[in-house]
Design a protein with these regions (language model features):
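Bacterial N-terminal signal peptides
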Residues: 18-26
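Short coil-to-beta strand junction motifs in C2/discoidin
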Residues: 81-88, 171
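Internal, hydrophobic beta-strand segments that form the core of beta-sheet-rich folds
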Residues: 151-165, 170-180
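Contiguous beta-strand segments within globular domains
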Residues: 62-73
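A beta-strand/beta-hairpin structural motif
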Residues: 119-125, 130-143
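Short amphipathic, basic-aromatic surface patches that mediate peripheral association
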Residues: 73-80
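Coil residues (strongly favoring Ser/Thr
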Residues: 53, 60, 102-105, 118, ...
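C-terminal motif of bacterial Sec signal peptides marking the signal peptidase cleavage site
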Residues: 29-30
């Protein structure tokens, strides 16, 4: 009898555990439902060299609508970033892809937006507290722009640091995230 009850209990608890896993997995996937693009570039242990221009290509968006463009920065606690701020030059160029209109003629590529901005990223508070999230690496998300993009839009993004020191230690990764806004 005890063995039978243990087997029943084991089956019930296994089903709840499996069901909980499915629910948590679904929620995690649903959180990124509108994630259109994300890519990070890594740097060597020495850091980010000033001559290293990062290039990101966002190719052919699947949905039209409003998007937020974010800069992502990850710093390492193993090799700490020695400054409070990070200044980067952020260049973006968006075009609509060529497409056929209702008369079946090919329409030219259209420039949607081009900009070059210097972004001051605050990584550490005046009190010395990290403003990012994480434990062994700190993640910082810096909002850059809100864009209205058509289906098939393509983007080219270039990022370079504009700090006085030619090599920045402690920067592990820099990337770009594009999310559709609902």
């Amino acid at each position: 009898m005890k063995t039978h009850l243990k087997n029943i209990w084991h089956q019930i608890s296994s089903r709840f555990l499996a069901g909980g896993f499915v629910i948590v997995s679904t929620l995690l996937v649903a959180c990124d439902e509108y994630f259109a693009f994300g890519e990070y570039k890594s740097f060597p242990k020495e850091g980010w060299y000033m001559r290293d221009t990062l290039h990101f290509v966002i190719d052919s968006l699947q949905e039209a609508g409003p998007y937020t463009l974010n800069l992502g920065i990850r710093t390492s606690t193993a090799n700490p970033y020695p400054y409070k701020d990070l200044q980067v030059e952020f260049s973006q160029r968006w075009v609509s892809s060529s497409h056929k209109d209702t008369t079946d003629s090919l329409q030219p590529v259209t420039l949607i937006k081009t900009s070059l901005d210097t972004i001051d990223c605050h990584l550490v508070s005046d009190k010395g507290d990290n403003l990012g999230t994480g434990i062994s690496n700190f993640q910082y998300i810096v909002p850059i722009d809100t864009l209205q993009l058509p289906v098939g839009a393509k983007g080219n993004i270039y990022i370079v640091h504009r700090m006085r020191k030619s090599t920045l230690p402690g920067i592990a990764n820099v990337g770009v995230e594009l999310r559709r806004v609902e």
